[in-house]
């Protein structure tokens, strides 16, 4: 995992095996191991088999309303299904990703909701269905004197060979709106920002 993420994930005090275990996890910015942002508590994983279908179950002390399940179906179509779950993260964790978050130093809460998410690969074509909603609550930054800046929702919806995105403002001094899509590895997004009256 460290190799795949180019060292951006740091595992410490791991217990168990690759099939079932837990670890302390931290995000590491490109600056190196001294720039670690630990995720509170431990992260747990467990592999199960439902007949011939493997399932990976992941949970985290800090952030998950219930375990997150990844189910892989093999055959003429390869399909990855992700269970419906609510996840809560403090925005301060984003500093562990490095620039630009370590400059912005955002604070607030990030809630992620997954609904019927499936990725299907058939005939070398990826199809996406389902929805992921990101709610950014009480966003603040050291670069802004306005606190909080606002509360925002980003919605990502799978629509076959493309994923559509929308951005809306629920409340706040900075009104943001936008829409876009990801299709054939090309991403476009148009957004508008204005101050509230």
What are these language model-derived features?
Residues 1-3:
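N-terminal type II signal-anchor transmembrane helix
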Residues 9-103:
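N-terminal beta-strand/beta-hairpin edge segment
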Residues 15-18, 62-67, 143-146, 168-177:
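Solvent-exposed loop/turn segments connecting transmembrane beta-strands
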Residues 34-49, 125-163:
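Beta-propeller and related beta-repeat scaffolds in trafficking/envelope systems
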Residues 158-197:
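Extracytoplasmic/luminal low-complexity segments enriched in Pro/Gly and acidic/polar residues
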Residues 27, 64, 76, 136-138, ...:
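Transmembrane beta-strands of outer-membrane beta-barrel pores
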Residues 17, 37-39, 106, 148-150, ...:
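Residues that define the transmembrane beta-barrel architecture of outer-membrane proteins
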Residues 101-139:
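Hydrophobic, aromatic-enriched interface-forming segments
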